[in-house]
Amino acid sequence: KEETGSDGNTGLCSSYLKYFMEDLADCFGAKGRHVLHASQCLSADVNAAFDPTFPDVMERNNCAYLNHGVCVTKFTGARGKSGTSDASAEFVGTVRQLLDKEQVVWQTGELGKVDGGGGGTVAAYIANLDVDTIDVGVPVLCMHAPFEVVAKIDVYMTYRAFFVFMAS
């Protein structure tokens, strides 16, 4: 539902995840809010890769590139500071250290220049539950076009990033 909005009782903005976590925690004698606060989330979402055909929509020094590994996106949003989700420096450090330790090739990237489009992800909705959350995913060339392009090494490194995160 992300591409059409995450609202309504079937979207991530609904209360179902919070209620589910509270019920699950209750089964083990814990409080849902404590479980959520102690949780960490890698929000699986793609990032825009630099497109040499349209270089003006990206900031070359702050964007993802194909064949440079999984993309870790500290913040998302559009229109300057609107609708953003911003991972804490501490959680970014935790993720970076884990990826480095496990030799996962990674890069950082933004979703485009300020006021040049950009976009949001569902990370903000998870982060609003008091869960440390960061976007991690594959850089994509021609995102949302009929023919999208990704690099095989980036897909593999994304798999590895999630694998080592879940194993830690």
What does each model-found stretch correspond to?
Residues 3-11, 81, 85, 112, ...:
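Hydrophobic alpha-helical scaffolding
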Residues 8-19, 86-94, 117-120, 153-160:
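Conserved active-site and cofactor/substrate-binding residues in soluble primary-metabolism enzymes
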Residues 21-28, 50-51, 99, 103, ...:
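Structural signal for hydrophobic packing residues in well-ordered secondary-structure cores
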Residues 138-168:
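His/Asp/Glu-rich mid-to-C-terminal helical/loop segments that flank catalytic regions of hydrolases
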